[in-house]
Amino acid sequence: MHRTNLLVLSGDPHRAPMARYRSDLRRLRASDPAVRAMTDFLREPPLTAAEDCALDTALDDMFRLGVRAFLVVRDLTVVGLITAEAIRQARRSAATRIVEVMTAAADMPAIDWQTLQDSTIRDLMEIFEGARVDHLVVLESKTAQHASVRGVVHRSRVERRLHLSADPL
């Protein structure tokens, strides 16, 4: 899928950041619909970081919020994805910015909204394993060249809800 002009669809931006993860308490089964594992940005605003943010600041914010990734934005347009793992692996100084380390929007691991609706949790786990990724951005196509970021699926949250991992994040 050609990914230019990715816009963030978002719900109520004033909702408390940690309130969004209450859905993580519901147990999942491998046969459940994959959409049950998605953080839907129509209901819960995404956690984002500006591309010029310092890596250390982004990592501190991730730790404080209990997350492992942020969408990277410029003027409400998604330009990439930054993960805690990418930050930890980067050679960095206080001057290193997200834009230097992030995965560009065109290279973000993604799944189409329609495909997600037709998938199960088992299918998601196979995608995570096969692609060796920890996050899948959910894209909703508007036209052949334009898509919006509808949500995200986090591997660690799926595993936790499947009771496959004791990892607290």
Explain the meaning of each model-derived region.
Residues 1-169:
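Tandem CBS (Cystathionine beta-synthase) repeat/Bateman regulatory domains
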